[in-house]
Amino acid sequence: MILTTSRKPSQRTRSFARDLERTLNIPYVQRGKLSLKEIFEIDKHVLLIGEFKANPGTLVVYDVENEKRLSSFISVKLQREICGEKIYNDDGIRIKISRELKDNEEFQKYYEIYDEFLFQHLNINEDSDITLRLEKDPKYLFAIQFYKGRVKIGPLIRIKSIKLFDSLL
């Protein structure tokens, strides 16, 4: 899986992309003038960060092999806003679900979608220091928060809505 942004990302969107690159330990490709087709030739699974009013506003996961895409409207908090420093992840990531969400049937549908499109393509390592935790958020469907041990390191991604499409474009 690779990470990229819209064509001319704002500074905040670039910072968010770099935060995800460091915490998820996946390569970030600067888009420049590359078309989506050229990006799809680099990797079959692409995580694209789109913008809304110069902020990261959408998270689109492309599954090129199955010609599907998952689009989510998001709200974010950067690493520097949460812990004030850059945290690097050299190995995989551990995924945990909060207790409130484990029993929620509606959340299970969202989790299965995200697992198919995103989580299965990450480097999962149960012994990792870095944890991707899915948490309940009162205003949103759910939130994705990153921890190192028990300390929040960010970025925080709040998922507002999820849509599935049967075409890449």
Curated annotation (Swiss-Prot):
Matches recorded under InterPro entries: Brix, Brix_dom_Rbsml_bgen_prot
GO MF entries: rRNA binding
NCBIfam families: PRK00933.1-4 (NF002094)
Function: Probably involved in the biogenesis of the ribosome.
Record has Ligase as a keyword: no
Keywords in alphabetical order: Ribosome biogenesis
Species this protein is from: Methanocaldococcus jannaschii (strain ATCC 43067 / DSM 2661 / JAL-1 / JCM 10045 / NBRC 100440)
SMART domains, A to Z: Brix
Name of the protein in its database record: Probable Brix domain-containing ribosomal biogenesis protein
Domain of life: Archaea
Record bears the keyword Ribosomal protein: no
Domain annotation Brix: ranges: 1-169
GO biological process, one term: rRNA processing
